[in-house]
Design a protein with these regions (language model features):
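Active-site-proximal beta-alpha loop/turn segments in soluble metabolic enzymes
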Residues: 99, 146-148, 181-193, 218-233, ...
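Conserved anion-binding
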Residues: 148, 156-215
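A charged N-terminal "starter" segment
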Residues: 1-168, 172-174, 215, 249
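Alpha-helix N-cap and loop-to-helix initiation/capping positions
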Residues: 137, 155, 192-200, 228-239
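Short, well-ordered amphipathic alpha-helical segments that serve as non-catalytic structural scaffolds
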Residues: 201-206, 237-247
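Single conserved hydrophobic/aromatic residue that forms the stacking wall/gate
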Residues: 253-263
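Short connector loops/turns at beta-strand edges and beta->alpha or beta->beta junctions
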Residues: 47, 137, 181-185, 213, ...
Length: 263
């Protein structure tokens, strides 16, 4: 460990990578034993027959498990929030069969690119059931999304300007949401969106209202990847409520129609 006393800069400790073959039942480098249990069938179909037909390696997805997990989550939220709407993130896995399964269960399509948007449309997802997120939306993609009444969450001032241009061309006002980033504990995910703590998000709200071409109808936030810490989502929800009251008290936006969207 090398330290500069003047600037208090510490050199990061180097840990040599560990590459070993893990075996079911034995501890890994973190002291945890993998809990994978071999089983011969998936949804009643013998795995050996699938391997004979498609070869190996082979990724197999259980439709029954997907549907059961979705219904469990929907039930858990619906008990407390009857108007909850679950959306499936296409970037997680955009295989058409998987996306179609969640669509059949009632999930909206959450997409982050024109490519994923096209997948949703190929599955006959209605525009109003598509949530269009992502930091790089082209004017062509936004124009299509507006025409098909998709739910659009703005990531930057550039998108505000693009959508205002589209609104002028179509002689209409466009409902939008904005993406917030915020301090949510140990996790830092502030690459995209408008910052809550610095008041950048509120400045974006004022800019949207001043333009007169867009209507704020939603708040969106993404907590990061591989994150199952419930406390982080609690923090996000609390800050969403704080921001809602800030908008209600300090701007002329109609807050009664605002929706919250977590990712």
């Amino acid at each position: 460990m090398a330290t500069k006393h003047n600037n208090t800069i510490q050199k990061q400790f180097y840990e040599k990578p560990i590459i070993i073959r893990h075996t079911v039942g034995l501890s890994n480098k973190f002291g945890r034993a993998p809990n994978a249990i071999p089983f011969p069938r998936v949804d009643g179909v013998p795995i050996r027959s699938l391997l004979q037909q498609y070869g190996s390696p082979l990724f197999i997805v259980s439709e029954q498990t997907l549907r059961r997990k979705y219904r469990d989550m929907k039930r858990a939220f619906s008990l407390r929030y009857p108007k909850v709407q679950i959306s499936y993130s296409y970037k997680t896995n955009y295989l058409s069969a998987i996306c179609a399964t969640f669509q059949d269960e009632g999930a909206y399509a959450e997409v982050v690119s024109g490519f994923e948007y096209e997948i949703a449309k190929s599955l006959n997802v209605k525009g109003e059931n598509i949530i269009f997120n992502g930091p790089h939306k082209t004017k062509e993609e936004l124009t299509r999304a507006v025409s098909e009444n998709a739910i659009i969450n703005i990531d930057s001032y550039d998108e505000i300007y693009l959508l205002e241009e589209i609104a002028k061309e179509k002689n209409t006002t466009i409902p939008v949401g904005i993406r917030l980033n915020m301090e949510i504990g140990a996790m830092h995910w502030d690459r995209f969106g408008f910052n809550f703590e610095s008041a950048q998000a509120f400045e974006a709200v004022k800019r949207i209202h001043a333009g007169g071409l867009l209507k704020l109808r939603g708040l969106h936030c993404h907590a990061g990847t591989y994150n199952d810490n419930v406390e982080i989502y609690r923090t996000m929800a609390e800050k969403f409520v704080q921001f809602y009251h800030i908008i209600k008290e300090r701007s002329e936006e109609h807050t009664s129609e605002l929706q919250s969207r977590f990712g």
